Amino acid sequence: MYKRQGVLRLVLELDGEEIISCDPVVGHLHRGMEKIGETIQYNQFVPYTDRFDYLAPLSNNIAYACAVEKLLGWELPPRGQALRVLALELSRFSSHILGVGVYGMDVGAMTVFLYCYEEREKIHNFYEQLTGARFTSSYTRIGGQTRDVPNEMLKEVLVFCDEAAKTLDETEALLLKNKIFIDRLQGVGVISREKALSWGITGANLRASGIKRDLRKLTPYLGYENYEFDVPVGEHGDCYDRFTVRIEEMRQSLRIIRQVIETMPDGPINMVDTKGTLPEKKKVLTDMESLIRQFMTTTMGVNAPAGQVYFAAENPKGELGFFLDSKGGGLPNRLRMRSPSFCNLSILPELMKGHLVSDVPAILGSFDFVMGECDR
Protein backbone atom coordinates (compact mmCIF):
# COMPACT_ATOMS: atom_id res chain seq x y z
CA MET A 1 0.00 0.00 0.00
CA TYR A 2 1.24 3.49 -0.87
CA LYS A 3 -0.54 5.99 1.34
CA ARG A 4 0.17 9.56 0.42
CA GLN A 5 -3.00 11.28 -0.82
CA GLY A 6 -5.45 8.43 -0.56
CA VAL A 7 -4.70 4.73 -0.82
CA LEU A 8 -3.07 3.14 -3.86
CA ARG A 9 -2.25 -0.58 -3.81
CA LEU A 10 0.55 -1.90 -5.99
CA VAL A 11 0.85 -5.64 -6.55
CA LEU A 12 4.49 -6.18 -7.52
CA GLU A 13 6.19 -9.28 -8.88
CA LEU A 14 9.87 -9.22 -7.96
CA ASP A 15 13.07 -10.92 -8.97
CA GLY A 16 15.18 -10.08 -5.96
CA GLU A 17 14.96 -6.26 -5.79
CA GLU A 18 13.99 -5.84 -9.45
CA ILE A 19 10.35 -5.28 -10.41
CA ILE A 20 9.13 -7.78 -13.02
CA SER A 21 5.50 -6.64 -13.18
CA CYS A 22 3.27 -4.07 -11.51
CA ASP A 23 -0.50 -4.18 -11.09
CA PRO A 24 -1.95 -0.97 -9.58
CA VAL A 25 -5.22 -1.45 -7.71
CA VAL A 26 -7.34 1.71 -7.53
CA GLY A 27 -10.89 2.39 -6.38
CA HIS A 28 -10.52 2.44 -2.60
CA LEU A 29 -11.97 5.99 -2.54
CA HIS A 30 -14.67 5.44 -5.17
CA ARG A 31 -17.83 7.25 -4.12
CA GLY A 32 -19.93 7.28 -7.29
CA MET A 33 -19.50 11.01 -7.85
CA GLU A 34 -20.56 11.00 -11.49
CA LYS A 35 -23.88 9.29 -10.73
CA ILE A 36 -24.47 11.64 -7.80
CA GLY A 37 -23.97 14.58 -10.17
CA GLU A 38 -26.77 13.26 -12.37
CA THR A 39 -29.30 13.22 -9.53
CA ILE A 40 -28.88 16.74 -8.09
CA GLN A 41 -28.98 20.29 -9.44
CA TYR A 42 -25.92 21.85 -11.04
CA ASN A 43 -25.20 24.18 -8.13
CA GLN A 44 -25.77 21.40 -5.61
CA PHE A 45 -22.91 19.41 -7.13
CA VAL A 46 -20.32 22.15 -6.45
CA PRO A 47 -19.53 20.92 -2.88
CA TYR A 48 -18.89 17.43 -4.27
CA THR A 49 -16.22 18.79 -6.62
CA ASP A 50 -14.26 19.92 -3.54
CA ARG A 51 -13.72 16.24 -2.78
CA PHE A 52 -12.07 15.35 -6.10
CA ASP A 53 -8.61 16.88 -5.86
CA TYR A 54 -9.04 18.03 -2.28
CA LEU A 55 -5.59 19.66 -2.36
CA ALA A 56 -6.92 22.20 -4.88
CA PRO A 57 -10.68 22.39 -4.28
CA LEU A 58 -11.12 25.79 -5.92
CA SER A 59 -9.67 24.42 -9.16
CA ASN A 60 -12.33 21.70 -9.24
CA ASN A 61 -15.13 24.14 -8.40
CA ILE A 62 -14.17 26.50 -11.18
CA ALA A 63 -13.62 23.81 -13.83
CA TYR A 64 -17.07 22.35 -13.18
CA ALA A 65 -18.73 25.78 -13.15
CA CYS A 66 -17.04 26.66 -16.45
CA ALA A 67 -18.42 23.46 -18.00
CA VAL A 68 -21.98 24.29 -16.96
CA GLU A 69 -21.57 27.91 -18.06
CA LYS A 70 -20.36 26.68 -21.45
CA LEU A 71 -23.55 24.63 -21.72
CA LEU A 72 -25.60 27.70 -20.80
CA GLY A 73 -23.67 30.01 -23.11
CA TRP A 74 -22.70 32.33 -20.26
CA GLU A 75 -19.55 34.43 -19.94
CA LEU A 76 -18.54 36.00 -16.65
CA PRO A 77 -17.82 39.73 -16.37
CA PRO A 78 -14.10 40.69 -16.38
CA ARG A 79 -13.77 41.00 -12.60
CA GLY A 80 -15.40 37.62 -12.10
CA GLN A 81 -12.95 36.02 -14.53
CA ALA A 82 -9.95 37.71 -12.90
CA LEU A 83 -11.10 36.56 -9.48
CA ARG A 84 -11.31 32.98 -10.72
CA VAL A 85 -7.82 33.16 -12.21
CA LEU A 86 -6.51 34.42 -8.87
CA ALA A 87 -8.18 31.49 -7.09
CA LEU A 88 -6.87 29.01 -9.68
CA GLU A 89 -3.26 30.11 -9.40
CA LEU A 90 -3.35 30.17 -5.61
CA SER A 91 -4.70 26.62 -5.76
CA ARG A 92 -2.01 25.59 -8.23
CA PHE A 93 0.73 26.97 -6.00
CA SER A 94 -0.80 25.37 -2.91
CA SER A 95 -1.02 21.96 -4.58
CA HIS A 96 2.48 22.08 -6.05
CA ILE A 97 4.17 23.38 -2.89
CA LEU A 98 2.66 20.52 -0.88
CA GLY A 99 3.61 18.02 -3.58
CA VAL A 100 7.21 19.25 -3.58
CA GLY A 101 7.41 19.16 0.22
CA VAL A 102 5.93 15.67 0.54
CA TYR A 103 8.13 14.45 -2.30
CA GLY A 104 11.15 15.56 -0.33
CA MET A 105 9.92 13.40 2.55
CA ASP A 106 9.39 10.46 0.18
CA VAL A 107 13.08 10.43 -0.65
CA GLY A 108 14.36 11.36 2.81
CA ALA A 109 14.47 15.19 2.96
CA MET A 110 12.33 16.26 5.93
CA THR A 111 13.40 19.91 6.24
CA VAL A 112 11.96 20.97 2.89
CA PHE A 113 8.50 19.75 3.87
CA LEU A 114 8.41 22.16 6.82
CA TYR A 115 9.39 25.13 4.64
CA CYS A 116 6.80 24.25 2.00
CA TYR A 117 4.00 23.60 4.46
CA GLU A 118 4.48 27.05 5.97
CA GLU A 119 3.78 28.66 2.58
CA ARG A 120 0.75 26.43 2.06
CA GLU A 121 -0.68 27.55 5.39
CA LYS A 122 -0.47 31.16 4.22
CA ILE A 123 -2.57 30.29 1.19
CA HIS A 124 -5.14 28.58 3.40
CA ASN A 125 -5.37 31.82 5.36
CA PHE A 126 -6.18 33.56 2.07
CA TYR A 127 -8.78 30.88 1.35
CA GLU A 128 -10.41 31.69 4.67
CA GLN A 129 -10.54 35.40 3.88
CA LEU A 130 -11.88 34.81 0.38
CA THR A 131 -14.29 31.92 0.89
CA GLY A 132 -14.86 31.59 4.64
CA ALA A 133 -13.30 28.10 4.69
CA ARG A 134 -9.74 26.81 4.67
CA PHE A 135 -10.15 23.55 2.82
CA THR A 136 -13.35 22.43 1.08
CA SER A 137 -14.59 25.91 0.29
CA SER A 138 -17.47 25.41 -2.22
CA TYR A 139 -16.73 28.99 -3.25
CA THR A 140 -17.83 28.94 -6.87
CA ARG A 141 -21.38 29.11 -8.17
CA ILE A 142 -22.75 28.66 -11.66
CA GLY A 143 -22.46 32.17 -13.04
CA GLY A 144 -20.09 33.60 -10.45
CA GLN A 145 -18.75 33.38 -6.91
CA THR A 146 -20.27 33.63 -3.47
CA ARG A 147 -18.40 36.82 -2.51
CA ASP A 148 -15.87 39.38 -3.73
CA VAL A 149 -12.25 39.50 -2.66
CA PRO A 150 -11.33 41.85 0.23
CA ASN A 151 -8.98 44.65 -0.88
CA GLU A 152 -6.75 44.01 2.15
CA MET A 153 -6.23 40.45 0.99
CA LEU A 154 -4.88 41.55 -2.39
CA LYS A 155 -2.13 43.53 -0.67
CA GLU A 156 -1.29 40.55 1.53
CA VAL A 157 -1.11 38.25 -1.50
CA LEU A 158 1.46 40.54 -3.14
CA VAL A 159 3.61 40.31 -0.01
CA PHE A 160 3.16 36.54 -0.03
CA CYS A 161 4.39 36.34 -3.63
CA ASP A 162 7.73 37.86 -2.62
CA GLU A 163 8.08 35.55 0.40
CA ALA A 164 7.08 32.45 -1.57
CA ALA A 165 9.64 33.22 -4.27
CA LYS A 166 12.36 33.17 -1.61
CA THR A 167 11.08 29.83 -0.29
CA LEU A 168 11.31 28.34 -3.78
CA ASP A 169 14.91 29.51 -4.03
CA GLU A 170 15.68 27.92 -0.66
CA THR A 171 13.99 24.69 -1.72
CA GLU A 172 16.09 24.50 -4.85
CA ALA A 173 19.24 25.19 -2.87
CA LEU A 174 18.43 22.40 -0.42
CA LEU A 175 17.42 19.74 -2.93
CA LEU A 176 18.72 20.44 -6.42
CA LYS A 177 22.29 20.81 -5.15
CA ASN A 178 22.04 17.67 -3.02
CA LYS A 179 23.84 14.80 -4.75
CA ILE A 180 21.87 12.11 -2.92
CA PHE A 181 18.56 13.70 -3.95
CA ILE A 182 19.70 14.10 -7.55
CA ASP A 183 20.99 10.52 -7.79
CA ARG A 184 17.65 9.16 -6.59
CA LEU A 185 15.76 11.08 -9.30
CA GLN A 186 17.87 11.45 -12.42
CA GLY A 187 17.37 8.65 -14.93
CA VAL A 188 14.60 7.07 -12.83
CA GLY A 189 11.05 6.67 -14.14
CA VAL A 190 11.83 7.96 -17.63
CA ILE A 191 8.76 8.60 -19.83
CA SER A 192 9.45 9.39 -23.49
CA ARG A 193 7.43 11.92 -25.46
CA GLU A 194 5.73 9.16 -27.44
CA LYS A 195 4.75 7.15 -24.37
CA ALA A 196 3.49 10.24 -22.55
CA LEU A 197 1.15 11.04 -25.42
CA SER A 198 0.00 7.46 -26.05
CA TRP A 199 -0.90 6.95 -22.38
CA GLY A 200 -2.86 10.22 -22.15
CA ILE A 201 -0.57 11.82 -19.58
CA THR A 202 -1.22 15.53 -19.01
CA GLY A 203 -0.08 18.41 -16.84
CA ALA A 204 3.41 18.77 -15.41
CA ASN A 205 4.08 15.05 -15.98
CA LEU A 206 3.56 15.52 -19.72
CA ARG A 207 5.56 18.74 -19.92
CA ALA A 208 8.45 17.06 -18.09
CA SER A 209 8.72 14.74 -21.11
CA GLY A 210 9.40 17.73 -23.36
CA ILE A 211 5.89 18.41 -24.70
CA LYS A 212 4.85 22.04 -24.34
CA ARG A 213 1.12 21.53 -23.80
CA ASP A 214 -0.75 23.77 -21.38
CA LEU A 215 -4.48 24.37 -21.80
CA ARG A 216 -4.08 27.91 -20.48
CA LYS A 217 -2.05 28.61 -23.63
CA LEU A 218 -3.56 26.06 -26.02
CA THR A 219 -7.25 26.87 -25.42
CA PRO A 220 -7.29 29.93 -23.14
CA TYR A 221 -10.22 30.37 -20.78
CA LEU A 222 -11.17 32.97 -18.15
CA GLY A 223 -8.93 35.53 -19.85
CA TYR A 224 -5.64 33.62 -19.50
CA GLU A 225 -4.63 35.02 -22.88
CA ASN A 226 -4.30 38.44 -21.21
CA TYR A 227 -1.50 37.33 -18.87
CA GLU A 228 2.14 36.73 -19.67
CA PHE A 229 3.67 33.49 -18.42
CA ASP A 230 5.94 30.73 -19.69
CA VAL A 231 5.28 27.00 -19.95
CA PRO A 232 8.25 25.13 -18.44
CA VAL A 233 9.22 21.81 -20.02
CA GLY A 234 11.74 19.10 -19.23
CA GLU A 235 14.17 17.24 -21.46
CA HIS A 236 14.42 13.65 -20.24
CA GLY A 237 11.00 12.88 -18.72
CA ASP A 238 12.45 11.44 -15.51
CA CYS A 239 11.59 12.04 -11.86
CA TYR A 240 14.08 14.92 -11.72
CA ASP A 241 12.39 16.76 -14.60
CA ARG A 242 8.93 16.25 -13.12
CA PHE A 243 10.19 17.84 -9.90
CA THR A 244 11.91 20.82 -11.55
CA VAL A 245 8.94 21.53 -13.84
CA ARG A 246 6.67 21.91 -10.81
CA ILE A 247 9.15 24.25 -9.14
CA GLU A 248 9.18 26.49 -12.22
CA GLU A 249 5.39 26.28 -12.60
CA MET A 250 5.04 27.75 -9.13
CA ARG A 251 7.20 30.69 -10.18
CA GLN A 252 4.94 31.23 -13.17
CA SER A 253 1.87 31.06 -10.92
CA LEU A 254 3.32 33.83 -8.75
CA ARG A 255 3.94 35.81 -11.92
CA ILE A 256 0.30 35.42 -12.99
CA ILE A 257 -1.00 36.29 -9.52
CA ARG A 258 0.92 39.57 -9.54
CA GLN A 259 -0.52 40.46 -12.95
CA VAL A 260 -4.07 39.61 -11.87
CA ILE A 261 -3.85 41.87 -8.83
CA GLU A 262 -2.21 44.72 -10.73
CA THR A 263 -4.85 44.63 -13.49
CA MET A 264 -7.89 43.66 -11.38
CA PRO A 265 -10.88 45.38 -13.06
CA ASP A 266 -13.84 46.91 -11.28
CA GLY A 267 -17.41 45.78 -11.71
CA PRO A 268 -19.61 42.82 -10.78
CA ILE A 269 -18.20 39.37 -10.08
CA ASN A 270 -21.34 37.45 -11.08
CA MET A 271 -23.56 37.25 -14.13
CA VAL A 272 -26.12 40.05 -14.26
CA ASP A 273 -29.59 40.13 -15.79
CA THR A 274 -30.01 36.38 -15.72
CA LYS A 275 -32.52 34.22 -13.87
CA GLY A 276 -30.02 31.45 -13.35
CA THR A 277 -27.93 33.09 -10.62
CA LEU A 278 -28.84 33.86 -7.04
CA PRO A 279 -29.55 37.54 -6.25
CA GLU A 280 -27.79 39.44 -3.49
CA LYS A 281 -29.06 38.68 0.00
CA LYS A 282 -30.02 42.28 0.74
CA LYS A 283 -32.20 42.35 -2.39
CA VAL A 284 -33.91 39.12 -1.38
CA LEU A 285 -34.98 40.80 1.87
CA THR A 286 -36.34 43.93 0.21
CA ASP A 287 -37.44 43.05 -3.34
CA MET A 288 -40.24 40.62 -4.22
CA GLU A 289 -38.85 39.77 -7.67
CA SER A 290 -35.47 38.87 -6.17
CA LEU A 291 -37.19 36.71 -3.55
CA ILE A 292 -39.07 34.79 -6.25
CA ARG A 293 -35.90 34.45 -8.30
CA GLN A 294 -34.03 33.00 -5.35
CA PHE A 295 -36.86 30.57 -4.63
CA MET A 296 -37.07 29.33 -8.22
CA THR A 297 -33.30 29.00 -8.63
CA THR A 298 -32.94 27.16 -5.32
CA THR A 299 -35.81 24.73 -5.79
CA MET A 300 -35.66 24.06 -9.55
CA GLY A 301 -32.02 24.79 -10.36
CA VAL A 302 -30.49 26.39 -13.42
CA ASN A 303 -32.64 25.75 -16.49
CA ALA A 304 -29.99 24.45 -18.89
CA PRO A 305 -30.73 23.90 -22.59
CA ALA A 306 -30.45 20.52 -24.27
CA GLY A 307 -27.01 19.76 -25.66
CA GLN A 308 -23.57 18.33 -25.00
CA VAL A 309 -20.39 20.14 -23.94
CA TYR A 310 -16.89 19.25 -22.83
CA PHE A 311 -14.73 21.68 -20.88
CA ALA A 312 -11.15 20.98 -19.86
CA ALA A 313 -9.07 23.03 -17.42
CA GLU A 314 -5.33 22.96 -16.70
CA ASN A 315 -5.47 21.83 -13.09
CA PRO A 316 -2.44 21.18 -10.84
CA LYS A 317 -2.60 17.43 -11.56
CA GLY A 318 -3.24 17.80 -15.29
CA GLU A 319 -6.23 18.11 -17.59
CA LEU A 320 -9.44 17.98 -15.55
CA GLY A 321 -12.37 17.64 -17.93
CA PHE A 322 -16.13 17.61 -17.50
CA PHE A 323 -18.51 16.22 -20.12
CA LEU A 324 -22.14 17.23 -19.71
CA ASP A 325 -25.09 15.82 -21.62
CA SER A 326 -28.30 17.74 -21.02
CA LYS A 327 -31.86 17.11 -22.11
CA GLY A 328 -32.94 20.43 -20.65
CA GLY A 329 -33.99 21.37 -17.13
CA GLY A 330 -32.12 21.60 -13.87
CA LEU A 331 -30.36 18.21 -13.87
CA PRO A 332 -27.77 16.78 -16.27
CA ASN A 333 -28.67 13.62 -18.14
CA ARG A 334 -25.04 12.43 -18.04
CA LEU A 335 -21.98 13.71 -16.21
CA ARG A 336 -18.54 12.36 -17.07
CA MET A 337 -15.30 13.45 -15.51
CA ARG A 338 -11.80 13.10 -16.94
CA SER A 339 -9.49 12.49 -14.02
CA PRO A 340 -5.86 13.50 -14.70
CA SER A 341 -4.54 11.39 -11.83
CA PHE A 342 -6.25 8.25 -13.15
CA CYS A 343 -4.85 8.80 -16.64
CA ASN A 344 -1.37 9.60 -15.35
CA LEU A 345 -1.23 6.49 -13.16
CA SER A 346 -2.29 4.23 -16.04
CA ILE A 347 1.31 4.06 -17.24
CA LEU A 348 2.58 2.48 -14.00
CA PRO A 349 2.46 -1.19 -15.17
CA GLU A 350 4.82 -0.36 -18.02
CA LEU A 351 6.89 2.26 -16.22
CA MET A 352 7.73 0.20 -13.13
CA LYS A 353 9.25 -2.74 -15.01
CA GLY A 354 13.00 -3.01 -14.56
CA HIS A 355 13.20 -0.60 -11.63
CA LEU A 356 14.21 -1.47 -8.09
CA VAL A 357 11.80 -1.56 -5.16
CA SER A 358 13.66 1.41 -3.67
CA ASP A 359 12.70 3.46 -6.76
CA VAL A 360 8.96 3.02 -6.17
CA PRO A 361 8.51 5.97 -3.74
CA ALA A 362 10.54 8.25 -6.02
CA ILE A 363 8.48 7.32 -9.09
CA LEU A 364 5.08 7.50 -7.41
CA GLY A 365 5.88 10.76 -5.64
CA SER A 366 6.99 12.38 -8.90
CA PHE A 367 3.48 11.89 -10.32
CA ASP A 368 1.92 13.98 -7.52
CA PHE A 369 -1.46 12.26 -7.74
CA VAL A 370 -4.57 12.41 -5.54
CA MET A 371 -6.65 9.27 -5.17
CA GLY A 372 -9.84 11.15 -4.32
CA GLU A 373 -9.80 12.53 -7.85
CA CYS A 374 -8.51 9.28 -9.39
CA ASP A 375 -11.24 7.10 -7.85
CA ARG A 376 -14.06 9.67 -7.94
Label every PLM stretch briefly.
Residues 3-376:
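Metal/cofactor-centered catalytic core regions of large enzymes
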